UniProtKB/Swiss-Prot annotation:
The keyword Metal-binding does not apply. It holds the Pfam family Herpes_UL24. It comes from Elephantid herpesvirus 1 (isolate Asian elephant/Berlin/Kiba/1998). This is Protein UL24 homolog. May participate in nuclear egress of viral particles. Plays a role in the dispersal of several host nucleolar proteins including NCL/nucleolin and NPM1. Since deletion of host NCL/nucleolin negatively impact on nuclear egress, UL24 supposedly acts on this process through its effect on host nucleoli. Coiled coil: none annotated.
Length: 232
């Protein structure tokens, strides 16, 4: 059911809180800072793993508020933590399920998370393990304290690294990232680097082999040249 009885001002407050959270994550420069904002949902095993953040990614029917993608290249594991934010002006989450607005937000958020996880998990292939976690976090609007969060199961599948990289590149919301870059404070050193598409071990191996062949050819030409000079 649509929550038409929610005042326009409260809707604006919710949108503003979303943006405030996204800015805070964008400006954060470490795993710990981001994990504190997200109430500790990030896997501790990836504390030292390179990662990239995506906001309002266009996944077709869904646009997750935030995605954090960890790329463990040596182990060939991609871990995607997908987060949907819901906000409330109330000081507590109604566990008795009598708050109609919160219950609507809860069901809507669960559908959004479920659909987004399904879309990301659909990029199958070989060569890389893909783990997708989908979280729904309820924040109190004035304190940004997490009042409630869902604890999902992890969707695990095999994927093709470059196909998944192409999905991330295609779905990145460039205009929203540009908005974050312009609106964040001058203390921000810049957006986090996009990790996918940079690591290409297969290509680098081919290039190395090619370079070796070129070196060998050059050496052979040099030896032939010396032989010619000696015969002359």
């Amino acid at each position: 059911m649509p929550v038409n009885f929610v005042a326009a001002r409260k809707k604006r407050d919710g949108v503003n809180t979303h943006i405030e959270l996204q800015k805070a994550i964008y400006k954060s420069r470490s795993f710990t800072e981001i994990n504190n904002i997200l109430d500790g949902i990030l896997p501790d095993a990836h504390r030292e793993t390179p990662f990239a953040t995506y906001f309002e990614a266009n996944l077709g029917c869904r646009r997750p508020d935030c995605m954090i993608v960890f790329d463990d290249l040596p182990k060939q594991i991609i871990t995607c933590v997908l987060v949907e934010f819901k906000t409330t002006s109330r000081t507590a989450f109604d566990k008795r399920k009598k708050d109609a607005v919160q219950q609507y937000q809860l069901h809507q958020g669960e559908e959004q998370v479920r659909d987004a996880v399904k879309i990301l998990s659909s990029i199958t292939g070989r060569g890389c393990n893909l783990r997708v976690w989908g979280f729904l976090l309820f924040y109190q609007q004035s304190t940004l304290r997490v009042l409630h969060k869902t604890i999902p199961e992890c969707a695990v599948t095999l994927t093709d690294r470059w196909a998944f990289s192409a999905l991330l590149k295609k779905s990145k919301n460039e205009s929203f990232h540009a908005f974050l870059q312009k609106s964040c404070t001058a203390s921000t050193t810049g957006p986090q680097k996009e990790l996918f598409g940079i690591h290409k071990p297969e290509n680098s191996e081919v290039e190395t082999v090619g370079a070796t062949k070129s070196t060998r050819k050059g050496a052979e030409k040099s030896r032939l040249s010396r032989r010619s000079r000696k015969s002359n």
